[in-house]
C-alpha cells in the first residue's frame, strides 16, 4: 500500500463532498463540503485543501448508471476531474462510485439524521465511501484503483 494522504471527491451539481485518508491510506473520514461554483472557485478551494493536507492523490467518484453506461453526471465528473488535475498538480484518478450517495443516505437515515438538514453531510459521506472503497481496492490488489486522469490539452 502506498503511503500519503489521499482526498476523496464526490462531484455534485450543487455541492462537492470531500473526504481524506490517514497518512497510511487505511481509513477515510469526512472532511468538508465545498459549494459548486460556475467558475474555478470550487477547484481553488480543493487545491487549498490539497496543499494544507499534503495530499498525494485525489480520487474522484465516477457516477455511472447501474448498467455501467455513462450519463450526464459521468461527463460532468470527468470534466471536473480533468480541470482539477490542471488546477492542483496532484495525480487524480476516477473510480466507479455507483450507489455511493444511496449508501450515504441510508447510513445517515440509520443514524437518525433527517434528509433535508443532512444534505451537506451526505456529500461528505458519499466522498468518504468513494475514498474508502478505493483504499480497500488498492489494499486488496496492490494496484492503484480506477484510472488516471490526464490533463486535457486544447478545446
Swiss-Prot record:
UniProt KW Signal keyword: no
Q: What is this protein called?
A: Putative pre-16S rRNA nuclease
Q: Where in the cell is it found?
A: Cytoplasm
The UniProt similarity line reads: Belongs to the YqgF nuclease family.
GO terms, molecular function = nuclease activity
Cellular component GO terms, alphabetically?
A: cytosol
User: GO terms for biological process?
Assistant: rRNA 5'-end processing
HAMAP family noted in UniProt = Nuclease_YqgF (MF_00651)
Q: What is its EC number?
A: 3.1.-.-
What is the first-listed, main subcellular location in coarse terms? cytoplasm
Pfam families hit by this protein: RuvX
Q: Which UniProt keywords apply?
A: Cytoplasm, Hydrolase, Nuclease, Ribosome biogenesis
Which residue intervals make up region (Disordered)?
136-155
Amino acid at each position: 500500500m502506498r503511503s500519503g494522504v489521499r482526498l476523496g471527491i464526490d462531484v455534485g451539481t450543487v455541492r462537492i463532498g470531500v473526504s481524506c485518508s490517514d497518512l497510511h491510506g487505511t481509513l477515510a473520514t469526512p472532511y468538508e463540503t465545498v459549494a459548486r461554483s460556475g467558475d474555478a472557485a470550487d477547484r481553488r478551494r480543493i487545491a487549498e485543501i490539497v496543499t494544507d493536507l499534503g495530499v498525494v492523490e485525489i480520487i474522484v467518484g465516477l457516477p455511472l448508471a447501474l448498467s455501467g453506461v455513462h450519463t450526464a453526471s459521468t461527463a460532468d465528473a470527468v470534466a471536473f476531474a480533468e480541470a482539477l488535475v490542471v488546477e492542483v498538480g496532484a495525480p487524480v484518478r476516477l473510480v466507479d462510485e455507483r450507489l455511493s450517495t444511496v449508501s450515504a443516505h441510508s447510513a445517515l437515515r440509520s443514524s437518525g439524521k433527517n434528509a433535508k438538514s443532512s444534505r451537506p453531510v451526505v456529500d461528505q459521506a458519499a466522498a468518504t465511501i468513494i475514498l474508502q472503497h478505493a483504499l480497500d481496492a488498492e489494499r486488496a490488489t496492490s494496484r492503484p484503483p480506477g484510472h488516471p486522469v490526464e490533463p486535457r490539452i486544447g478545446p
